[in-house]
């Protein structure tokens, strides 16, 4: 488990009571059942859904429907938003995988239940975005309400996406600069395939996640803060820019790969053309030498004192004539 997420309370990673002023206090697993929230307070619980005790708490003590629990605990999810009625909703998001040995595009699922005064989030693998939110709360500059907890989580998830896509674009810039600086330089095809696969993996989850932000900007739940829509619209715009950047990255990679393919094809064509010219040049001379060397009724000119030099002169004449013909035909 990552150092930035270390829960040892039977699946509860973080428990926090928000005081409505950007800060709050931590709560342990045993305190949850006896909490008595003040009117301005909200509760945020962050769980490791891979721990059986966390799953048991969700089903037995969270007060959620079986349908909601099944969705929160299912194995395979895609980013989506579900209105559960009664002023509550489920939000399924994805974050960049920064765990050791993992591929960043293998995005980590974050499942969130939220209502007016409570947010329950679950993950299987650690997410740095959650730790960033906790740091804000510890510093007294974090979310003040349940709706802001959901927004802060989405905001920090999007920050990681921004950084990752900028890194991909920078790597591609370096490849393009290398190719432009030296016409003979070949781009690293393995690197291009990796960048293309990474871009496709990110796009798979970011496109539906952008739609979630757009939906949340239009939601009119009573516990949403008045300016929430503006913040969700900004996140929607950021993800839209990221998706456009991913599309541009894909096009740039395609251009590099097509240019390299054309370069290889042209080099092969030049090589084949050169081999064809060489073959065409020496074929008549090979015919003459083969004809002179045929051992039927004796070798022509074998008894002549200058036979060898005459044969060389004949071959030289054929070569000169061929060179003249090739030049006239612009083959050389």
Curated annotation (Swiss-Prot):
Transmembrane recorded as keyword: yes
Keyword terms of this UniProt record: Cadmium, Cell inner membrane, Cell membrane, Cobalt, Cobalt transport, Ion transport, Membrane, Nickel, Nickel transport, Transmembrane, Transmembrane helix, Transport, Zinc, Zinc transport
GO cellular component labels: plasma membrane
Pfam family, one: CorA
Membrane topology type: Multi-pass membrane protein
Cytoplasmic side: 1-277, 324-332
Transmembrane domains' residue ranges: 278-286, 308-323
Location within or outside the cell: Cell inner membrane
Domain of life: Bacteria
CDD domains reported in the protein's UniProt record: ZntB-like_1 (cd12833)
Spans within the Periplasmic topological domain: 287-307
Catalysed reaction equations from the record: Zn(2+)(in) = Zn(2+)(out); Cd(2+)(in) = Cd(2+)(out); Ni(2+)(in) = Ni(2+)(out); Co(2+)(in) = Co(2+)(out)
A single BP term in Gene Ontology: cobalt ion transport
Family matches, as Gene3D superfamilies: CorA soluble domain-like, Magnesium transport protein CorA, transmembrane region
Chief location of this protein within or outside the cell: membrane
This protein's record includes keyword Cell inner membrane: yes
Record's subunit section: Homopentamer.
PANTHER family to which the protein is assigned, alphabetical: CORA FAMILY METAL ION TRANSPORTER (EUROFUNG), ZINC TRANSPORT PROTEIN ZNTB
Protein name: Divalent cation transporter CmaX
Lineage: Bacteria, Pseudomonadati, Pseudomonadota, Gammaproteobacteria, Pseudomonadales
């Amino acid at each position: 488990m990552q150092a930035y997420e270390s829960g040892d309370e039977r699946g509860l990673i973080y428990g926090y009571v928000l005081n409505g002023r950007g800060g709050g206090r931590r709560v342990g697993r045993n305190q949850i059942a006896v909490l008595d929230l003040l009117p301005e307070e909200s509760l945020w619980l962050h769980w490791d859904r891979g721990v059986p005790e966390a799953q048991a708490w969700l089903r037995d003590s969270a007060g959620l429907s079986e349908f909601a629990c099944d969705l929160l605990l299912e194995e395979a999810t895609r980013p989506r938003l579900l209105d559960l009625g009664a002023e509550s909703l489920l939000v399924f998001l994805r974050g960049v995988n920064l765990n050791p040995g993992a591929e960043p595009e293998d995005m980590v699922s974050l499942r969130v239940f939220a209502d007016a005064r409570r947010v329950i989030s679950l993950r299987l693998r650690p997410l740095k975005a959650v730790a960033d939110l906790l740091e804000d709360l510890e510093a007294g500059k974090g979310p003040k309400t349940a709706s802001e907890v959901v927004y802060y989580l989405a905001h920090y998830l999007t920050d990681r996406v921004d950084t990752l896509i900028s890194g991909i674009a920078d790597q591609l810039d370096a490849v393009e600069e290398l190719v432009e600086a030296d016409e003979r330089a070949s781009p690293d095809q393995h690197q291009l395939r990796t960048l293309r696969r990474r871009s496709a993996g990110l796009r798979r989850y970011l496109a539906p996640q952008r739609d979630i932000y757009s939906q949340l900007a239009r939601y009119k739940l009573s516990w949403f803060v008045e300016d929430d829509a503006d913040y969700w619209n900004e996140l929607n715009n950021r993800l839209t820019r990221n998706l456009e950047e991913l599309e541009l990255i894909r096009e740039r990679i395609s251009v590099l790969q097509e240019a390299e393919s054309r370069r290889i094809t042209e080099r092969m064509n030049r090589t084949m053309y050169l081999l064809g010219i060489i073959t065409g040049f020496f074929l008549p001379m090979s015919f003459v030498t083969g004809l002179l060397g045929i051992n039927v009724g004796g070798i022509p000119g074998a008894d002549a004192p200058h036979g060898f030099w005459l044969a060389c002169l004949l071959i030289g004449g054929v070569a000169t004539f061929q060179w003249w013909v090739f030049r006239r035909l612009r083959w050389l």
